[in-house]
């Protein structure tokens, strides 16, 4: 028997499957089942299904094992020397443990972003498109995988795969429910995310990001986060103007690192368990940068580790 408060997130996740089967709202509050709301898309009902149909203890154990293995496999698929892969594992171990203790899908998001990059590097456009679409339809974060579009060798094939997988992910939950129900849940999903964004604004345990830092220090709720996000997007996009660098793997790794950092730094949903995503970016930045590491580089690495810990 597992204490309910210890695996609340997993209870929310498995509830997505059972509520889809029963055609109940995925975004209502069910205080007799778990605390908090679900914030994942309807396709998550199929992702979590294998772990929801078995007893809680077994499902939870398998869920954690699959999350950890997914991250391990994604890193192993990178065109990166084994020693650097091992460094990434050790550097991210603390954040991985934190996310595992909270049963969080953020581990899978990190794996999806890294995996989509690795697939593009290997010329597997269909696989990359699947990962990007799945991550987007589950938790939106996956959409940042489109940042690797300029590195895709066969762009028409990639675009067609994105469209095809989007159709599949949109209609797939209908197999265990109905078209009307699923379409209605997509509408509710948008409304729940909008509400959650407002709830996170001054939350102590949420919005642990650049957006949240500025918001909480200023104490102002009157301005739009776009005032911070748009300049951030502009800075993020500047490296893409270096067209001649696209052919260099070190440059592409720098973009991957930037993507992994950006998705959390500019999200109001950032919390402790999301930091597995940017930590992977920090480790990749340190191990793949083409210049000799300076004392400042080491200091930044240590600062990030200590700050998060």
Regions found by a protein language model. Name each.
Residues 137-140, 168-172, 307-308:
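Membrane-embedded alpha-helical segments of transport systems
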Residues 132-150, 267-277:
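Transmembrane helices and adjacent periplasmic/lumenal helix-loop junctions
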Residues 286-309:
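Aromatic-enriched
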Residues 150, 154, 284-285:
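Interfacial segments of multi-pass membrane proteins
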Residues 126-130, 299-302:
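The feature captures the transmembrane alpha-helix scaffold of multi-pass secondary transporters
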Residues 94, 263-264, 283, 304-308:
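Alpha-helical transmembrane segments of multi-pass membrane proteins
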Residues 1-127, 152-275, 279:
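Primarily membrane-embedded glycan-assembly and transfer machineries that use lipid-linked glycans
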